Amino acid sequence: MDKIVFLEPVFCERIWGGRNLESFNFDIPEGNIGEAWVVAAHDNGSSKIVNGELAGLTLKEAYSENPQLFTEKKYDKYPLLIKILDASDNLSVQVHPEDDYARVNENGELGKTECWYVLDAKEDSKLIYGHTAKTKEEFDAAIDNEEWDKLFVEEGVQKGDFFYIPAGTLHAIGEGILIYEVQQNSDTTYRVYDYDRVDKDGNKRELHIKKTKDVTKVPFKKVATTREVENKEGATITYLADERYFAVYKLDVSGKVTLEKNKTGNLFTVLEGSGVVRVGGDSFDVKKGDSFILTIACDTFELEGSMFLIGSYDK
């Protein structure tokens, strides 16, 4: 039984994408590539397993055949989706539904709570995080009257920032920001504003005004996150989020460290540097851009090198 599986990402062209994902040692296709789905098991895209007994299967296929290898809890579908996003232009202002709304209105899809770790940001970069409306009537009227400057809340952003985005939160990643995103396994997005831009065929993208009004939480309440830091010989662990659907933490490795895996499957992406992962007597070289899952069969693992990773697991 495999204790570690490495994954080949899925790449998505986006109107707001660019070429910055090449910096992760990815061989990205031509075009404006906005997203790398580095750990994915969704109908719209699934990472491919590249090592071990499961090599050649997509993660979606492997989870369908053997879910107990990947998660302690039993889910109808793999619970998380992890992406790296290159916002070379502004993303649309958007919102995602909670589970119950998505289940009824999106053919059984999950809701989408997510979080962002800012990998890089140009000077003076901004994102939209929340809105100013105090009542549902005020929110709906601001949309109907297109009072975007009045409605949207902008926030400055810099490398190393972290944001927790519960379902129902109005948000948008701004131009010049590179994001690592951990989210529920959902691809449902409701756009409310898209800067009146057109795609390569001259068409504006669909907006979802009614659904945005249905699911956006009013008033907006920012969810504060606190960072707890644990120093170990060979590594510093920064705990970023421990929320309803997932926990997320940052690993800065500067030597050799042995760690216990959480009881469920743990997902990792190397985001800077390189090193070695040792699991059950086997060693694997890893570099920036590599993503892997430590399965239920793994208890402890060792990291060695000089690298920065983000780890996460389902709740």
Regions found by a protein language model. Name each.
Residues 151-164, 178, 279-298:
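Short acidic-glycine-tyrosine-enriched beta hairpin
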Residues 77, 85-90, 121-124, 169-189, ...:
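Ligand-binding loop in jelly-roll beta-barrel domains
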Residues 141-149, 274-276:
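Short, structured beta-strand/loop micro-motifs enriched in basic residues and often containing a Trp
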Residues 145-151, 162-164, 170-221:
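An exposed, glycine/acidic-rich loop-and-rim segment of catalytic or binding clefts
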Residues 1-134, 194-223, 248:
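Transition-metal
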Residues 117-139, 237-241, 253-264:
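Short beta-strand/loop turn elements enriched in aromatics
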Residues 225-288:
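Acidic/His-leaning functional-site neighborhoods
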Residues 82-83, 91, 108-109, 114-117, ...:
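His/acidic/aromatic-lined binding-pocket segments of jelly-roll/cupin-type domains
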